[in-house]
UniProtKB/Swiss-Prot annotation:
Entries under InterPro entries matching the protein: CheB-like (IPR008248), CheB_C (IPR035909), CheY-like_superfamily (IPR011006), Sig_transdc_resp-reg_Me-estase (IPR000673), Sig_transdc_resp-reg_receiver (IPR001789)
UniProt xrefs under SMART domains: REC (SM00448)
Organism ancestry: Bacteria, Pseudomonadati, Pseudomonadota, Alphaproteobacteria, Hyphomicrobiales
Pfam family, one: Response_reg
Protein name: Protein-glutamate methylesterase/protein-glutamine glutaminase 2
Active site: residue positions: S181, H208, D305
Protein modification: Phosphorylated by CheA. Phosphorylation of the N-terminal regulatory domain activates the methylesterase activity.
Catalytic reaction list: [protein]-L-glutamate 5-O-methyl ester + H2O = L-glutamyl-[protein] + methanol + H(+); L-glutaminyl-[protein] + H2O = L-glutamyl-[protein] + NH4(+)
Amino acid sequence: MIRLLIADDSALVRKLLEGVFLEEGDFEIRTARTGLEALDMVRAFDPHVVTLDVQMPGMDGLTCLGRIMLEAPRPVVMISSLTEQNADATLSAMALGAVDVIAKPGGTFSLELDRLRPLLVATIRSAAQAKIRPTHRLADRIRHQFRDAASSPRAKAARRGAARQRAKAEPAPGLVLIGTSTGGPAALNILLPQLPADFPWPVLIAQHLPATFTGAFAKRLDRECALNVVEVDVPRQLEPGTVYIGRGDADVIVAPRPSGLIALSVPARRDYPWHPSVERMVDSALEHYDGKRLLGVLMTGMGDDGATAMTRLQALGGRTIAEAESTAVVWGMPGELVRQGGATLVLPVEEIAAAVIEWGNADAAD
């Protein structure tokens, strides 16, 4: 049995969610109305998975999550309304260790429940398999979540602008492709800030997230990274010094234009089950780049999205990195890349950036 704690201040939402999982037959469920009740229930019930609403009376979901991750770490899924404020809070939660997010529908919750049911069940089952490892780094992020880390934003912007101009002096020789899902936002928060502003290759990312959150995620990363970070909400020229985040609920591909190659958001296709699709992103890059000029990184996530395409990328002369099982929240996608024999390197998340920098700089110098 999977022990599930549902924390939401709406009695209707609690009842509806409880009904969904009781029908599955293998869930034992408790509910909480406030963050404080949720903390007490975590201690008493010891759930395998917790769902948290962002907005709750007394103690909000973000504060409750921080306490859970410090005192009794376990998989937490945020269930958030589709507002800009909640999107930012939800991304803060994922930086603190929440493994996934489900967007509440904008209309009547009960009317949308049948559409959401498969996603709800799949997400919670995936979260139940996640491995949460408390670390000093995570504790530090929790304790300093609300402190502004940028002591001199203007100085940082000036340095970043100068480095971008140096990086753009020559056409980008290649492309970094990153795919991730469950646990990905926290992993990207570790990897991307390590890349320098003059990194010579553009970086294209497919992170499985609802559309409401990818724009806010790009803005958050842009504040924390030396590289420019943007959402692919419009066609974007692929340029050095820039990270491109695929828009949620769509796919992101590489496409040609007279001015050069671009990152393009396109409608999701049914033959690719996850979105933004890592597999489709890599397939499109292989149509326009020599395999030797591609670097694939597959990180934490349920399932196998991207593993086959990245194995093909390696066979065509490219290089790939699979996140090690020791740091992946869910070793599904990177594990499948390893099983297919398509991983050039297998590295813990903290070491991936160094390999990306070494390979990118070496190839740029060729």
